[in-house]
Amino acid sequence: MSEQPDYPAVELTEEGLAQAADAAIRAFGVASNLDELNIARRDHLGDAAPIPQARRSLGTLPKDQRKDAGRLVNMARGRLEKHFAQVKEVLEAKHLEEMLKAERVDVTVPTTRHQTGALHPITTLSEKIADIFVAMGYEVADGPEIEAEYFNFDSLNFIPDHPARTLQDTFHVGEPGSSQVLRTHTSPVQMRTMLSREVPIYVVCPGRVFRTDELDATHTPVFHQVEGLAVDKGLTMAHLRGTLDHLAKTLFGPETKTRMRANYFPFTEPSAEVDVWFPNKKGGAGWIEWGGCGMVNPNVLKAAGIDPEVYSGFAFGMGLERTLQFRNGLTDMRDMVEGDVRFTLPFGVQA
């Protein structure tokens, strides 16, 4: 660091102060960069500089001279600081311009490609199905995963000793006698919707469900379903069939077909299994079991306070893991739940 020059004392006169200010302004003017300007500022505005020293010497003057001398010192200092600010602004602009030139980015240089993440295929498939139904005028409904037995079983026409209610099939949670379970299907959302909304009702209910299955190539204790419910006047199995046909063709392609096989579910009557003809099935085109469906059981409508003599409804549901598995030719359901990022990256499975 350079030493500060040893300046002679400044006369507390207008001429003496003007000479000191002129010397400082000349020093500011010859500075070629901010570092040199800061050195000049220290030399001419620092504590040992002439004008600050002149200010401190005001106390040695007779009282009647201090006011005028103080005014002259302040004028000189103000002139100096104003000029310093002007020079600093110019040098800062010059420094910024030089810095920008030195840091110029060559846009022709190839960049490093960063790997991006992707939504899990189950999430993407769920959102796609929801979008299909929203386009048909349906609403998306959701409900709690920890559910009362009443909504999971009783209100859906499950008899008290139905095997699905046992510990072998259902996770019972909470204190003994609390009647709380991890929902085994998304059908409770349908009942909650019927209780909370006025008819007509058209909703689709995607969500996570839980069953006491062992994790293997075709089963998982935590999986995803999507269910649909329509309640209105005059609905029939024909409306249900048309809805499922539209869903299948939109999801799998225009050559896709559906068929129904009679079955039994407590909450629908009549009930059916729905199969889909999938032209891109691994091993060749063929029929694949897809889900369950049927007309809403009158007892379920009554539990929701809906008159089955006036209104009818249909419902359907399918597993998203199974849908993704046959649509994308996956052989092991464990790939969907083990969290391997290679499974979800864009170049992997696309949903």
UniProtKB/Swiss-Prot annotation:
Its EC number is 6.1.1.20. InterPro entries: aa-tRNA-synth_II (IPR006195), aa-tRNA-synth_II/BPL/LPL (IPR045864), Phe-tRNA-synth_IIc_asu (IPR004529), Phe-tRNA_ligase_II_N (IPR004188), Phe_tRNA_ligase_alpha1_bac (IPR022911), Phenylalanyl-tRNA_Synthase (IPR002319), tRNA-bd_arm (IPR010978). One of its GO terms (biological process) is phenylalanyl-tRNA aminoacylation. It is found in: Cytoplasm. Gene3D superfamilies: Bira Bifunctional Protein, Domain 2. Its cofactor is Mg(2+). This is Phenylalanine--tRNA ligase alpha subunit. It comes from Corynebacterium diphtheriae (strain ATCC 700971 / NCTC 13129 / Biotype gravis).
